């Protein structure tokens, strides 16, 4: 869980630092095909990395083997990205630590990672 938590925290902090740029990219991507394609490629990079991590967790018997890794990575990445957008661009106030904790728990729950498996792996 520490890796998921650290990844979520790093993403949220980077998004927070770059909120104005992220807002602009979102707006321009809606009207410019080149920018939209750039954002899609950037997003795919994160999704593919997350899918590899999910496959690894499945291979180690930690995550639900019946979950499609690529689809799960796409959905979970979208969840974190949209929360970052809602918080730092739209301005829906949320405490960083509460965001990190909640998003990390949702990740673990979605992959049906038991708490005890995470504690054993982190030691």
Language-model features: locations:
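Amphipathic alpha-helical packing segments from all-alpha helical-bundle domains
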Residues: 13-17, 23, 33-59, 70-74, ...
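Short, hydrophobic secondary-structure boundary micro-motifs
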Residues: 22-25, 37-38, 66, 119-120
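Transmembrane helix-loop junctions in multipass membrane proteins, especially transporters and channels
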Residues: 90-94
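C-terminal effector-binding regulatory domain of bacterial HTH transcription factors
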Residues: 113-123
